[in-house]
């Protein structure tokens, strides 16, 4: 059984969706970020960086952090979504999501909605970055129709 330490964030949802799709048995341990539960000593033993998601595979006594590593682990554990002939291209797009899509859209959301000082520079910078990300994704999707 997999234990998922979860909050309803994009990274948390990635893992819960993968668990549902793979039909791997799991249980959710909710982590309330608004109450700083990710910074409590018992959670820091699981992830010293105090971030979600994290999983424990109780069958293997394995703790994993970082959404990309967890997604790869779940794909390999379930023998799904990671065909050997396309593995490197799958990793390429996973890394694109981890290093571009997530951070840029996350920063755009943050600076557009939560920045108390309102920074037009930041909003415009991440908006332009988001346009580049969406253009790259659209171009790839067009190639694979």
Give, region by region, the residue ranges found by the protein language model:
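GST-like domain detector, emphasizing the conserved glutathione-binding G-site
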Residues: 1-125, 131
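Hydrophobic alpha-helical bundle segments that form small-molecule/ligand-binding pockets
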Residues: 134-145
């Amino acid at each position: 059984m997999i234990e998922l330490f979860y909050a309803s964030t994009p990274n948390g949802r990635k893992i819960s969706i993968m668990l549902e799709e793979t039909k791997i048995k799991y249980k959710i341990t909710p982590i309330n970020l608004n109450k700083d539960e990710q910074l409590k000593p018992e959670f820091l033993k699981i992830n010293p960086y105090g971030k979600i998601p994290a999983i424990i595979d109780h069958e293997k006594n394995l703790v994993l952090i970082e959404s990309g590593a967890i997604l790869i682990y779940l794909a390999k554990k379930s023998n799904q979504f990671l065909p050997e002939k396309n593995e490197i291209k799958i990793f390429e797009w996973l890394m694109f999501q981890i290093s571009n899509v997530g951070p840029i859209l996350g920063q755009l959301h943050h600076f557009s909605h939560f920045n108390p000082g309102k920074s037009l520079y930041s909003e415009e910078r991440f908006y332009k970055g988001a346009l580049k990300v969406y253009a790259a994704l659209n171009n790839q999707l067009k190639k694979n129709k």
